[in-house]
């Protein structure tokens, strides 16, 4: 059958499914359907999600849950034990005393599979509960501190080679001068806690502490140093780490500068937003083992533009030095499009995954959710819209100026990403997710070399007047790595007529990008085909003028 006939048949098949393909068949990931973890009429916000360290079928998520009549705040408990096929749980953590719960959960699963949850209370303080039956029942409350504080975040040492294997950590900002980061540890699955200790002694108040495990028992924390007057804009990022289980910390109060977005976002119904840092570390044993990544939301400080952008900084030497900022979102700079609330996760292959709210494909009063994925430590990014419906952010009445939640989250399990976020498409803010299958992770963990042919989806798409097409020629083996082969990249219209040849030359192994300028062509659907001696793939793109 001729190429022309094949393309015509392909066109007839795909035209009715254009929207579905744009949402669900994206490059090297397969995006499923959006669904709620625990459908209810309760407001659900500020979600976290973690995976069991030795049983990837078990995933645990928690969030703020708010009931208004009578007014009650608790922590949702949402669990799957079958890899995400089904979820169970409750909008109320059942650890006594239930009436004294106050939300703001921090969660972890330790080496024994014990769920540990920290929360604030009806009065000042930080409290914890644990579950040894996958969230079905919970312990009575354990008091960690009676201080007034910002929510705690948690991590657990699940690396058997670590001298602190099994220890779990909680970190938070204390709401008293000088507003330092504090922490406590538990060695018995949350049954008892160490006396809280101070990590840093900031000149400018700390905000938004985050914590994660590195290799060899190292623990890393980060926070934002904020300005001294409202709106307390994030001014720089501080980082600290301990190599001895928290006995001592090496502190860098200003690891790198930032310019955050703390305040109200007028374009989104005056919701409250922030630029607080989120940290992740590669512990895969691959080529970027030990790399540390911190993501923030910034504007008016390069590489961020005049609109809020997602910015990544990384350290390849254990936090001793930090890269310049890397702009993650790939939409045009200063285009009046807004990205905010990023969450970061390194999967088992060393892939770097970020989710964030983004309005590039909708109106300025609405938002969708995007995934950005890098398989080379943040040098190059692929982006995918993962929400199948946009929503209009609005504050939740009665919960403080502009409140609709302050963070989202992401984890991975069994070759799938599990992002979680809140949106109000059903009328109430609810926690949503979507399984994202990493269908063909193509970077060799040992060599860091590309091992599969790839033809990426063009970006932007739809486009006007130009778009970029990225493709990959793999390394076959060491003896053939320098060999080249003939590569053609051609564009066809819907009738199968060749429009232009973008490339017709020999290429060696590597990642390439070609720009297609369509200013002389009419609007419509086009197809681009990559052909080599051993690989052929065709994708569609839409020109809208």
Language-model regions, residue ranges each:
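Alpha-helical transmembrane segments and their juxtamembrane interfaces
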Residues: 14-15, 62, 471
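Short, proline-centered helix/strand-breaking motifs
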Residues: 15, 53-56, 460, 478
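Extracellular, repeat-based ectodomains that mediate carbohydrate processing or recognition
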Residues: 21-440
């Amino acid at each position: 059958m001729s190429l022309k006939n094949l393309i015509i048949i392909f066109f007839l098949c795909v035209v009715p499914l254009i929207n579905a393909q744009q949402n669900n068949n994206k490059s090297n990931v397969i995006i499923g359907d959006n669904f709620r973890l625990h459908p209810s009429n309760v407001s659900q916000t500020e979600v976290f999600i973690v995976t069991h360290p030795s049983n990837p079928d078990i995933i645990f998520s928690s969030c703020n849950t708010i009931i208004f009549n009578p007014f009650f705040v608790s922590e949702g408990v949402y669990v799957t034990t079958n890899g995400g096929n089904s979820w169970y749980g409750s909008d109320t953590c059942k650890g006594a005393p239930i009436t004294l719960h106050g939300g703001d959960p921090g969660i972890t699963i330790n080496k024994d599979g014990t769920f540990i949850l920290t929360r604030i209370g009806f009065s000042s303080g930080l409290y914890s509960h644990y579950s040894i039956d996958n969230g079905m029942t919970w312990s009575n409350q354990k008091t960690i501190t009676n201080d007034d504080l910002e929510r705690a975040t948690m991590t657990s040492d699940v690396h058997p080679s670590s001298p602190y294997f099994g220890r779990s950590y909680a970190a938070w900002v204390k709401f008293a001068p000088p507003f330092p980061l504090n922490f406590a540890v538990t060695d018995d699955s949350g049954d008892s806690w160490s006396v809280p200790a101070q990590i840093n002694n900031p000149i400018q108040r700390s905000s938004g502490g985050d914590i994660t495990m590195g290799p060899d028992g190292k623990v890393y924390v980060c926070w934002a140093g904020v300005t001294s007057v409202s709106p307390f804009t994030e001014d720089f990022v501080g980082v600290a780490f301990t190599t001895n289980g928290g006995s001592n910390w090496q502190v860098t109060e200003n690891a790198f500068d930032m310019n955050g977005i703390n305040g109200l976002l007028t374009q989104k119904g005056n919701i409250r937003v922030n630029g607080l840092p989120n940290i992740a570390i590669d512990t895969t044993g691959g080529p970027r083992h030990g790399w540390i990544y911190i993501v923030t939301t910034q504007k008016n400080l390069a590489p961020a533009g005049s609109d809020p952008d997602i910015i990544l900084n990384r350290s390849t030497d254990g936090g001793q030095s930090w890269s310049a900022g890397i702009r993650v979102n790939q939409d045009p700079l200063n285009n009046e499009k807004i990205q905010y609330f990023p969450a970061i996760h390194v999967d088992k292959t060393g892939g770097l995954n970020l989710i964030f709210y983004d309005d590039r494909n909708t109106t300025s009063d609405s938002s969708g959710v995007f995934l950005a994925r890098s398989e080379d430590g943040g040098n190059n990014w692929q982006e995918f819209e993962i929400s199948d419906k946009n929503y209009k952010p609005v504050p939740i009445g009665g919960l403080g100026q502009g409140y609709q939640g302050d963070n989202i989250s992401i984890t991975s399990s069994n070759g799938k990403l599990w992002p979680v976020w809140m949106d109000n498409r059903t009328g109430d803010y609810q926690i949503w997710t979507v399984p994202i299958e990493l269908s063909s992770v193509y970077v060799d963990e040992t060599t860091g070399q590309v091992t599969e042919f790839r033809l990426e989806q063009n970006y932007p798409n739809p486009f006007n007047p130009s778009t970029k097409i990225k493709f990959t020629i793999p390394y076959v083996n060491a003896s053939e790595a320098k060999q080249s082969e003939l590569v053609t990249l051609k564009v066809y219209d819907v009738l199968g007529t060749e429009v232009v040849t973008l490339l017709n030359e020999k290429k060696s192994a590597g990642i390439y990008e070609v720009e297609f300028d369509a200013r002389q062509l009419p609007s419509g659907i086009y197809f681009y085909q990559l052909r080599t001696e051993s690989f052929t793939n065709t994708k569609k793109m839409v020109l809208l003028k």
